[in-house]
Each structure stands twice: as C-alpha cells, then as structure tokens.
Curated annotation (Swiss-Prot):
Keywords: Chaperone, Cytoplasm
Statement: the UniProt record of this protein carries the keyword Transmembrane: no
Keyword Transmembrane part of the UniProt annotation: no
Assembly and binders: Homodimer. Interacts with RavA.
Pfam families: VWA_CoxE
Highest taxon listed in the record's lineage: Bacteria
Species classification: Bacteria, Pseudomonadati, Pseudomonadota, Gammaproteobacteria, Enterobacterales
InterPro entries the record matches: Uncharacterised_CoxE (IPR008912), Uncharacterised_ViaA (IPR023481), VWF_A (IPR002035), vWFA_dom_sf (IPR036465)
Protein family according to the UniProt entry: Belongs to the ViaA family.
Descriptive protein name: Regulatory protein ViaA
Matching SMART domains: VWA
Function statement: Component of the RavA-ViaA chaperone complex, which may act on the membrane to optimize the function of some of the respiratory chains. ViaA stimulates the ATPase activity of RavA.
Record Gene3D superfamilies: von Willebrand factor, type A domain
Localization per Swiss-Prot or TrEMBL: Cytoplasm
C-alpha cells in the first residue's frame, strides 16, 4: 500500500507548507487567543510545544495510507510516463476505462481532451500527462488537508482540555514561567475534571493558611552558602532553647510515690472502687503516697543571653531536591492531615518554580512513594492527596528510607523534610548515628515540620531545623484572630 509520504515525494507536494499553515491557524484560533490573554505565563509554554506538534503531524502524514483507488491511478500514471507516443496511443482506451472505473476527477476531462483531437500527437501526449499530474497533485493535496484537518480538530480538543486543566492549576502551582512550562508538560496526562479539583481544593485551603504557606517558602529558601563575617561588635539580646531534664511522657523509668492520678498503677486505682479502702485512697492521695509510674525525658526552655552582633554576606547556594516524609498515623488525621497535604503542595510549587525535584514518602506501617515533579506529577499529586491518614507511626523506617534515597548520586544534595506531630517512640541508636554522619560528612540537612506542640524533644533534637506549626485549637483561633 502506497503511503502519503511517498506520494508527496513522487508528486513534489510540499507537506511542510501545509503543516505550517495548519499550526498558524490553530494558534490564531479564538479559544487560544482568549486563553493567552488570561494566562500569559502559559503562552510561552504552549508555544514551546509547537515543535512537538510539527513532528507529530509529520509522523501522521508519513504513516497515512493512500486510498486503493488513488494508489492504482498513480501506478497507471507512472507506467504511462514510460510509454512512447505510439505505445500510449495503443494503451489510451484502457487508460480511459481505468480512470472511469476509479471515478478519477481527471476521467471526464481526459475523455474530452481525447475527443477534441482526432490525432494523438507527441505534444498531445505530453499535455495529457501534464494535466493528469496536476489532477493527481490536487488529489494528494486534498488528502493531506483532510488528514491535517482531522489532526487539527483532535489537537485543538487536546489543547483545550489541557488549557482548562492548566488554567485551574496555574494560580496554585505556577509561580513563574519555569513553573508554568513544567505544569503544561505535566498536563499531557489523561485527567478528568473531578481529579484535579482535589488539587484546587487543597490550594484554596493553603491560601486560607498564609502562615503555613510562608513556612513552606521559608523552608524552600533556607539553603544559603558560606557566610562572610564582618567585625562589628554591637551587642544584641539573643534567645535560644536549651534542653534540660524534665518529667515528660517519653519513657518509663521506674516507680515513685506521688499524687499524679494520670500515671497511677492499676492496683492503686482498684482500691478506689472498694468502699472500705476509699478513704485510705484519698488519704494517700493528699499525702502524695500513691504508687505511680516515674517517667523520664527532656524538655526545652528559653534562655536569654547577649552576644556581639555579627553581620554576614550570603552567597546563595544551588538548591537541591526535596525528600519529604509525611506521617500518616491516626494522630495526624483531620486538620493535621489537611495541613500536611497543603504543605507538600506548597513545596511542589516551589520545586516547579526553581526546577527542583519533590519526592514524597508516606510512612506509617509501610512506605508509599510519589514524585510530584516528574512528567506524571499531577497524577502523582492527586494520588497523594487522595490518601487517608489512618496508620501507625514507624519513624525509624521513615529515616531508613530517607537515608537509602540519599545514598544515590541523583539525591546527593537533597534536603530531607519530615512532617509529623513527632509523638512516637525514640529512634534507634543506629538510625541516630547514621543521620548525624550524613549531616556531618555529606552536609545533608534534615528539617522537621512539627504539627504539634507536644512532640518529643528526644526525637526532634536530631534535626537541623525545626519548623513549628501548632495545629491545636488554641493556636488555630489565635492565627485566625491575628488576621
């Protein structure tokens, strides 16, 4: 079967001109003009897609098959070119019959040309072939235009669908032209309106939590280069958190006598239900003689000191990818879950704007992974946002997964971010020592985004930076009131 590309070559039909005309008509369509005016950042991204469209159209024309009737007519034309004038005269009745049988547009004109001349001369032979060639060129051009029109309709439908999706997501995920271009590339997947509306929903939630958005932006800008100190010696007040022993619920350290009802031993609590021993229970409660669990831990207090002011010049460092671990335990459900997902969406926005990678790991009893900055980033983001936080907490496995990822060459300059309430068991010593080694030797930075004011200091002290966003009701009301 003859291909359209071969036919174009045989008849010297310029398909490039037809393709360019089609693309110009597509870009000038009213739908795209309105979209470009509304979303100017996406105009450059769509324009950058033109070479891909051009290549796809070339491929479509190259692979298209010529109809059998036109193929047979072209073969007859090629054979007729090889005939001498006497041979052509002999074959002419068969040629005319073939053209009539194939319903060729040239058939009627060919018969009229022959009937108008009683003698077939060499000049008439040449004229017959020239006009036949023109007829074939018209048919080939029409076939090209039909195929390109079909492709234009399909391409316009695809572009309109992607424009609708990108237009919805552009205010949420595109912070500059780089992000707009990457967002347009991601929109090539097959998504339904209800799917990406989930991203819109969490984007609106993020806008309602400006403090959370600012926190993500501060974390994204936190990597700075070597500082150059200056010799200015003014004093300033400096506040820092210091760790000290305290009775916080981290681990059981033994038994003690106290009046702490929340930490009573079960036998002591049982005496309260016995009438004869009830007064004895109250006496021991007043005298702080009840047997209770003794808990050991650490807490933090603010220490105020004075130190010389040090002015520094900062040279911005290249920023690496994000590896974000999200705690999906039951305690992270509800408002915590919304904040954690919205925070990851904010990091995705930063990653798209700065051409960084954003890799999400959900940890509870198992680890689930998503890459939000890849070609399928929007689909991955939708799957991530669809997850429910109902598991347990296995922080050690989370750190092991992070460390395994940091060993690979492509993640050597990554920053690790752990989003949790940090109400969990202490980390094993081998995990702690490995994290410290990565911080010391490879300069990897570990960030904690604490969603609770009750996170265990013993866990959180391993991080380079702690970004606090208290999701308690009191803090939520205070933030709303300050706005």
């Amino acid at each position: 079967m003859l291909t359209l590309d071969t036919l174009n070559v045989m008849l010297a039909v310029s398909e490039e001109g037809l393709i360019e005309e089609m693309i110009i008509a597509l870009l000038a369509s009213p739908q795209l003009a309105v979209f470009f005016e509304k979303f100017p950042r996406l105009k450059a991204a769509i324009t950058d897609d033109v070479p891909r469209w051009r290549e796809a159209l070339r491929s479509r024309l190259k692979d298209a098959r010529v109809p059998p009737e036109l193929t047979e007519e072209v073969m007859c034309y090629q054979q007729s070119q090889l005939l001498s004038t006497p041979q052509f005269i002999v074959q002419l009745p068969q040629i005319l019959d073939l053209l009539h049988r194939l319903n060729s547009p040239w058939a009627e004109q060919a018969r009229q040309l022959v009937d108008a001349n009683s003698t077939i001369t060499s000049a008439l032979h040449t004229l017959f072939l020239q006009r036949w060639r023109l007829s074939l060129i018209v048919q080939a051009t029409t076939l090209n235009q039909q195929l390109l029109e079909e492709e234009r309709e399909q391409l316009l439908s695809e572009v309109q669908e992607r424009m609708t999706q990108s237009g919805q997501l552009e205010p949420i995920l595109a912070d500059n032209n780089t992000a707009a271009g990457r967002l347009w590339d991601m929109s090539a997947g097959q998504l339904k309106r209800g799917d990406y509306q989930l991203i819109v929903k969490y984007g609106e939630f993020l806008n309602e939590q400006p403090e959370l958005k600012r926190l993500a932006e501060q974390l994204g800008r936190s990597r700075e280069a070597k500082s150059i100190p200056r010799n200015d010696a003014q004093m300033e007040t400096f506040r820092t958190l210091v760790r000290e022993p305290a009775t916080v619920p981290e681990q059981v350290d033994g038994l003690q006598q106290s009046d702490d009802i929340l930490r009573l031993l079960p036998p002591e609590l049982a005496t309260l239900g016995i009438t004869e021993l009830e007064y004895e229970f109250y006496r021991r409660l007043v005298e702080k003689q009840l047997l209770t669990y003794r808990l050991h831990g650490e807490s933090w207090r603010e220490k105020v000191i004075e130190r010389p002011v040090v002015h520094k010049d900062y040279d911005e460092q290249p920023r690496g990818p994000f590896i974000v671990c999200v705690d999906t335990s039951g305690s992270m459900g509800g408002f915590n879950e919304q904040c954690a997902k919205a925070f990851c969406l904010a990091l995705m926005r930063i990653a798209l704007a700065e051409n960084r990678r954003c890799y999400i790991m959900l940890f509870s009893t198992e680890i689930v992974r998503y890459e939000l900055s890849g070609p399928q980033g929007i689909e991955q983001a939708i799957r991530f946002l669809s997850q429910r936080f109902r598991g347990g907490t296995d922080l050690a496995s989370c750190f092991r997964a992070i460390m395994e990822r940091l060993q690979s060459r492509e993640w050597f300059d990554a920053d690790a971010v752990v989003i949790s309430d940090f109400i969990a068991q202490r980390l094993p010593d081998d995990v702690t020592s490995k994290v410290k080694e990565l911080q010391r030797v490879h300069q990897h930075r570990f960030h904690a985004v604490a969603m609770s004011a009750h996170g265990k200091p013993g866990i959180m002290r391993i991080f380079d930076h702690i970004w606090r966003f208290d999701t308690g009701m009191r803090s939520r009301l205070l933030r709303r009131w300050r706005r």
